Amino acid sequence: MKNKIKIRLKSFDHRSLDQATKEIVSAVKRTFAKINGPIPLPKKIGRFTVNRSPHVHKKSREQFEIRKHKRLLVIGDPNPAVVDALSKVDLAAGVDVVIELESGE
């Protein structure tokens, strides 16, 4: 049986996302576990167009965009020390973390 832990990180700021991935990778490497990544996933760009004026001047518009950056880390065959190390990692406030445990047969 082969177990894997998949960690997906999401953030609007790529610098804080890269810092969080470095902290997680260094914590996992201290436990001598096999880690793949960080794998950069495609970023999502949301664009919004709004009128500048609330009443007239339809041709005068303003555009905004928001970028969501994502990374994937895969830890192969984790042991209890890896789970303990991951629970002690302190990450930045703007980073969203999703952890999945996948068991293969």
From Swiss-Prot:
SMART domains tied to this protein: Ribosomal_S10
Coiled-coil regions listed in the entry: none
Any one cellular-component term (Gene Ontology): ribosome
Signal peptide span: none
Spans traversing the lipid bilayer: none
GO biological processes: translation
Protein name as it appears in the record: Small ribosomal subunit protein uS10
Natural source organism: Rickettsia rickettsii (strain Sheila Smith)
Gene that specifies this protein: rpsJ
